[in-house]
Amino acid sequence: TRALGMDIGGEREYGVGMFFFPQEELRRNQAKKMFEIIVEKEGMEFLGWREVPTFPNVLGHKAVECMPYIMQGFVKKPADVEKGLPFDRRLYIARRVFEQSSDDTYVVSLSSRTIVYKGMFLVGQLRTFFADLQSEDYESAIAMVHSRFSTNTNPSWERAHPNRLMVHNGEINTCLLYTSPSPRDS
């Protein structure tokens, strides 16, 4: 962010959004502008965009063919909003409003705590695809990786794990089934 001329402030003073935009420049620019407007309407300051450096040559043909344009957006925490959950709630609202207004952009994550790196590739390709994950300057307290092949849907960039808040192996439906009241309990 320093190289881009952005003053993001201290820890948890900013939110980072990871976006999968359309490759088409006009549609991408329209979606970016829409997000900027929504952030401002939600009382926050939009700081700028960053192209996420990637190495598509490590991916398979199909993944490259449908690869989105990957960018990060930076949002400054308002002075009147506390760090942590209050700020993340504001970011959540901005994300949801944006998702309702944009059909062809996927918000991978938007948070002051986490940045989700994901895609349509194997676990071993994660680090080689995203240049950020190879950088000595990049630090993280925790990293979670999840790998699973799609069993009942076609693979896509947005369906790849991890999701914004958790990693799972598809057993959620089973758990829900076991916790639902039985018809015999009625």
Predicted regions and their residues:
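Extended, highly charged
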Residues: 3-141, 145-147, 151, 186
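Conserved small/polar residues in nucleotide/adenosyl-binding loops
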Residues: 178-185
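A short secondary-structure junction signal
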Residues: 129, 155-157, 177
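Acidic loop->beta-strand submotif enriched in PP2C/PPM serine/threonine phosphatases
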Residues: 154-164
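Conserved phosphate/anionic-ligand binding catalytic regions in large, soluble enzymes, centered on
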Residues: 1-2, 164-177
